Curated annotation (Swiss-Prot):
The gene is xecE1. The active site is at Y150. This is 2-(S)-hydroxypropyl-CoM dehydrogenase 1. One of its GO terms (molecular function) is 2-(S)-hydroxypropyl-CoM dehydrogenase activity. Coiled coil: none annotated.
Amino acid sequence: MLDAEVIAITGGAAGIGLAVAHAAIRAGARVALIDRDGACAQRAAAEFGAAAWGVGADVTDEAAITAAMAGAQRALGPLTGLVNNAGIAGFGSVHATEVETWSRIMAVNVTGTFLASKAALFGMLERGRGAIVNFGSVAGLVGIPTMAAYCAAKGAVVNLTRQMAADYSGRGIRVNVVCPGTVAGTDMGRQLLGTDCDPELEARRLAKYPMGRFGTPEDIAEAAVFLLSTKAAFVTGSVLAVDGGMTAI
């Protein structure tokens, strides 16, 4: 599905990002793992061998993310795909959210997606081909209580995806967004369910999922790989909810 493709993944050292890397490599791609924790990114890349390269970079730092994309291309070849996975969540209604918290959530989720895309797009535009998969959330599709900043940020990512598709689809670059529900076994999933995995909280959240379970990193990764591949050649500007039916009810 991804033979000879070179895919950069932000937040690629753990969780969903690492699952995307595994799935992309199985599909034939080489991957650049870009993560704020550079040592973790390099360790993960070393486990993949020649199919991967890892580097530390903060997606909110334009110089750092631009250098990371350039390094990825030197190590692996021209980028043909980008997965904007790096993100953070936070809790608080509007009246209870500090501006510093709001700004940080916006910076990582929205500005980080913008900066990583900008850094990757120049080469894609020169070559006239590419695929970008942004990561939204069901929180960008519906209102989630006490998650004002996160809902606003992921809603912005969803509409930025549509705008990018409008700009670049005619130039050979497809742009889509995956919107996961709660994903078990990730830092964000643990944050949503509580660090002590409170059974009552978990049961209340699980009741919102018609399929009767939370997602796994692999569920989300397979959706991303599909959108990166030529099997999705006529798919652009799409919002793919991978949420076990949560937003269907």
